[in-house]
Amino acid sequence: CYTMKVNRRTAIKITAAGVSSFALTPDFFAASEAAEPFGKKYPQLDSLTTGEWWKKGAGAKTQLKGRGRKAAAPPMDVPRDQVMAFAVYTHQAGVLKMTAQLYPLKPGEERLARLEFKRDGEWVEVKKSEVRYPGWYAHFRVENWDDSQDVPYRVRHGAKAMFEGRIRRDPSSKNEIIVANLSCNSSRTAGGRPEIVANVMEQDPDLLFFGGDQTYRHTEHTVGWIEFGMQFRDIIRDRPTIC
């Protein structure tokens, strides 16, 4: 991990890429709830977060990059008040974009995520979004965003699960901004990243840029993405993040 200073013009070009999201067609989502949403030829893909995932148990080992390399996966069956894992966001030209990531949901659980902002001391719901399968994520887009002020937010699921953070104002008064540049997050090293997170917090960057290889779990992509987000959630919760 390292930080760098970039001028505002360069930063605008970077953030135009948007936030950790990609477009999928409606036909793709027609596979919703399928035990093998990627087809019978690829039963190993996302096997720990699709189908009857809760029966798979904790501690399953997943294939990593490189022949014969495996590592235990983090548990996906978490307490239901903890299913809202994390969220990433960017904003530019009056548009706020956010992607909330949930742990896998069980049959009968609500498939909606809710975005709230704190205004005048009160939490106000502004958007609802479908939780997509496979992947267990929800996208939010807010138009006419006032980027001149910090705004507390939280993303909720059900009655108790939530992830809170802060939408930072646009640092337009700065001639230079600080960008934290991180990459190559090993999946062989389980657990948190407390030293990295603490050092990044000390730098207090305006923008986080994860340049690639957020996970090396090459068949369990959702597990790897959730693992990465949980490792860095305390720095991504209150600043724009590009992955």
How should each PLM-predicted stretch be described?
Residues 36-243:
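Divalent metal-dependent phosphoesterase catalytic cores across multiple superfamilies
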Residues 10-32:
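N-terminal export signals
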Residues 1-6:
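Secretory targeting signals
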